[in-house]
Amino acid sequence: MGLSDGEWQLVLNAWGKVEADVAGHGQEVLIRLFTGHPETLEKFDKFKHLKTEAEMKASEDLKKHGNTVLTALGGILKKKGHHEAEVKHLAESHANKHKIPVKYLEFISDAIIHVLHAKHPSNFGADAQGAMSKALELFRNDMAAQYKVLGFQG
């Protein structure tokens, strides 16, 4: 399930666009996640009160959390699949503290791909989308494996 060097290059090139505005991209990803899958909002006590897209866009806390999420993911993607330590740490917090099901990682992966394509259509074509999809699937599979080790049925 690994990615070729060329696929990793596509992933990292696309991620370079994210790094120009991590917080803005992160906020858009979370808005897409929460509006597309409102049940995910229930896992975030800090954001449960945000009912509309306008409220979400106005939330500095949501923007900060989006920055945190995409900064962590960027660090993982840059490891090109050699992310065992990072995934272990992330899985521990997401299983034990936050109780985030693997399905929600699928939802946010879809949101990331949607936002990247919407914001950067000329730099995020079918090849880049496919590579990013594979990279995010690798991440999710490794998170799921770590969840199993931790005994989390997420």
From Swiss-Prot:
Name the record gives this protein: Myoglobin
GO cellular component terms, alphabetically, are:
extracellular exosome; sarcoplasm
Please provide the record's keywords in A-Z order: Cytoplasm, Heme, Iron, Metal-binding, Muscle protein, Oxidoreductase, Oxygen transport, Phosphoprotein, Transport
Binding residues annotated for heme b, in chain numbering: 94
Q: Which reaction equation describes what this protein catalyses?
A: Fe(III)-heme b-[protein] + nitric oxide + H2O = Fe(II)-heme b-[protein] + nitrite + 2 H(+); H2O2 + AH2 = A + 2 H2O
Instruction: Please name the GO terms that the record assigns under molecular function.
Output: heme binding; metal ion binding; nitrite reductase activity; oxygen binding; oxygen carrier activity; peroxidase activity
What's the source species for this entry?
A: Cervus elaphus
What does the record give as EC number?
A: 1.7.-.-, 1.11.1.-
The residues covered by the Globin domain are: 2-148
Q: Provide the gene name from the record.
A: MB
Give the protein's function: Monomeric heme protein which primary function is to store oxygen and facilitate its diffusion within muscle tissues. Reversibly binds oxygen through a pentacoordinated heme iron and enables its timely and efficient release as needed during periods of heightened demand. Depending on the oxidative conditions of tissues and cells, and in addition to its ability to bind oxygen, it also has a nitrite reductase activity whereby it regulates the production of bioactive nitric oxide.
Query: Can the keyword Transcription be found in this entry's annotation?
Result: no
Question: What is the first-listed, main subcellular location in coarse terms?
Answer: cytoplasm
